[in-house]
Amino acid sequence: QNGIEFVMYPRDYIIENVGPAINSEWDDFAPVVTADERFMAFTTRRQDGNTNENVFDDNLYYEDVFYSEKVGDKWSVARRIGEPINIPYHDSNLAISADGKQLYLYKSENGGDIFLSERNPNGTWTNPVPLNQNINSTYSENSVSISPDGNTLYFSSNRPITPGKTDLDIYVSKKDSKGQWGPAKNMGPVINTEYDEDGPFIDYDGKTLYFSSKGHKGMGGYDIFKS
């Protein structure tokens, strides 16, 4: 019923393919872009340039993080971001800070945790380190977004808020006076439903939160919402 309603009242949006400098014949996904739109990191399962020449159990190449920089108004040919971010196994980017100096990554350790790598002045990246236990739990944390001022973190987790309830919800954490991430708070029923909410992205206006949901009124499955 919802799908019929949305089809009857379409919105005008233009979707453009960013082209062969970024996209390959393999899966390319999860792009994150700096506020000035000059730097992009994304995850790919392409063969060319992959850290691991072997394939995973699904017969696809391992996830690797690649990046591209804008030259004029065009994206440069994407390149592997390199060690220590790229490893012989799955590595995937989740978010980038507005200034492009911090890259948040997902690793499958401990059920799925969020890691942080910082960009050095020479363009290399530091060893990814896990965020503190207020963010990472024994459950899965698999998406994250950082506010433009770097002081608020939005992330998804399937940690149970009631016994037996392990759907994905979106949480928020703020930095304390020591620069550490404080206790995570569930964003409540305005954002979260009894189904999965995932993929939060706080816009660079610092006010608009985009996320995907299976529970809010949509076409079915995951749809994109904003609040």
Cite the ranges covered by each PLM segment.
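Short, conserved micro-motifs composed of acidic
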Residues: 1-227
